[in-house]
Amino acid sequence: MKFELDTTDGRARRGRLVFDRGVVETPAFMPVGTYGTVKGMTPEEVEATGAQIILGNTFHLWLRPGQEIMKLHGDLHDFMQWKGPILTDSGGFQVFSLGDIRKITEQGVHFRNPINGDPIFLDPEKSMEIQYDLGSDIVMIFDECTPYPADWDYAKRSMEMSLRWAKRSRDRFDSLGNKNALFGIIQGSVYEDLRDISVKGLVEIGFDGYAVGGLAVGEPKADMHRILEHVCPQLPADKPRYLMGVGKPEDLVEGVRRGIDMFDCVMPTRNARNGHLFVTDGVVKIRNAKHKSDTSPLDAECDCYTCRNYSRAYLHHLDRCNEILGARLNTIHNLRYYQRLMAGLRKAIEEGKLESFVTEFYQRQGRPVPPLNVD
């Protein structure tokens, strides 16, 4: 992987990730394909929304279908027939979300398989081996996603262990001869001094990109913005920056304003299946009765297949009848909305008009522009 940085506007960056499998224009949003599929979508449909890279889930793909079946096909690209690049998370967040059924030690994490209850152990070395078999174009180190709230002492211990796991991840990645990219993950909760230590330690180890982890886990938005404002200027300018598990459209906008290049989140697909649809002026809850006889498109400014062909009334009807097509059409639209938003942000950065774009984005939704505390 090669990262090319074209231009900046304030702290926002316009560039691209270059892989053997294709080019990803940044800032970029990555749809989430947890089990080797973006739910309800064929790879061709995902590509048609404008997505150039997707995310797969190491933890879930390890449990099902498993490494051996994956290797029978070649790798995850061959298994799911996605031709572009794939980023896989390390399994750290899924382990974090298991809560009481896992035990974290210096060696790794002991937990029970959520499918059948069998005892399982996952550590940095195993995570690197699984992601190697998946053929991931971007591999994420294995870390502990520090929960929120966490006091300073716990956050420090967690961050320091994640740094040790980062070195173990780096060593195993290299010993496998993996020629793809490996990203480090910055931890430290909402504490700036701990984030500083994490950044310094990761940069000393050396990675192809740097992710900001441990955010969007329940902390106030102001804390997320503050940590991004503090961390991003410390990161190498020639490496991509990835905000993990984020988020709502406004979170993408605010991340870009603060220097983030990559995002992923289940929100557009999960919300689509629940009839919660993103449009230029905000959000449409298609289940509401007011859409029952509305013949207008979901979003007159959207060029997706759904908006070009179907009315709000039809989408409302599909939702009320619990038809599978409704979830699919909603997903097509939400993913296209996210990709159109990213394209708009990229164009605004190119033209040096990002803050004008941001102002219009919030004005259309009747909301104030969040403060930006950067030099």
From Swiss-Prot:
One of its GO terms (biological process) is tRNA wobble guanine modification. Keywords: Glycosyltransferase, Metal-binding, Queuosine biosynthesis, Transferase, tRNA processing, Zinc. Binds 1 zinc ion per subunit. InterPro entries: ArchSynthase1/Queuine_TRR, TGT, TGT-like_sf, tRNA_ribo_trans-like. Gene3D superfamilies: Queuine tRNA-ribosyltransferase-like. Homodimer. Within each dimer, one monomer is responsible for RNA recognition and catalysis, while the other monomer binds to the replacement base PreQ1. This is Queuine tRNA-ribosyltransferase. It comes from Salmonella paratyphi A (strain AKU_12601).
